[in-house]
């Protein structure tokens, strides 16, 4: 009898598995494909504080994100590295004072941080072979953290295994029957697992698992957060983004 069966091998699933097994629980994780084969390998590949959330006054979220960024930097320096972002000032979008206050707040909310703080830059004089248009005269630099997202998933999974978790790949959950005090879960290879609890960490497939597999009725809907990432050739030799 397992204490916990986790459905989904993305960053949430393996992170929960690592945490739970570290607390002494008997854990099995089931993934229908490979680890990080879906959303967790399609991210922005950034661990960031969410600077844009300052405009909607979500200060607690930004503070928590910045603290977690420092945690990742300290425990996984081999797969993460600081990256500087250059934010050109466009006068008709935001005034200079607003950008500066926002970045000062971004630095302050992070508390004691090891990444370089934000600063003002002259875009025409501070960079060699500046590729930006001439009408961009000034801007600001700030720091965030880039990371290998898929590798972060694999490292969490490996640590969970080392602590005693069972991770089953290329094997989907086909049925889950609720008994009085446990779940009986059937996998696609006909294997049966009994578990005290199930965590549905299947990302955009959570409602499918809930309704079709666990037979749980719900009127809840799923709001997907989607974005587009554009990859372009590097235009100059600087390290900034």
For each feature predicted by the language model, list its residue ranges.
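Beta1/beta-strand and adjacent pyrophosphate-binding region of the FAD-binding site
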Residues: 1-12, 28
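Short hydrophobic core segments
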Residues: 7, 193-203
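Glycine-rich FAD pyrophosphate-binding loop
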Residues: 21-41
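Central beta-strand plus flanking loop segment that forms part of the substrate or channel wall
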Residues: 47, 218-240
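Helical element adjacent to the flavin cofactor pocket in flavoenzyme catalytic cores
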Residues: 140-189, 193-196
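Flavin (primarily FAD) binding-site architecture
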Residues: 200-215
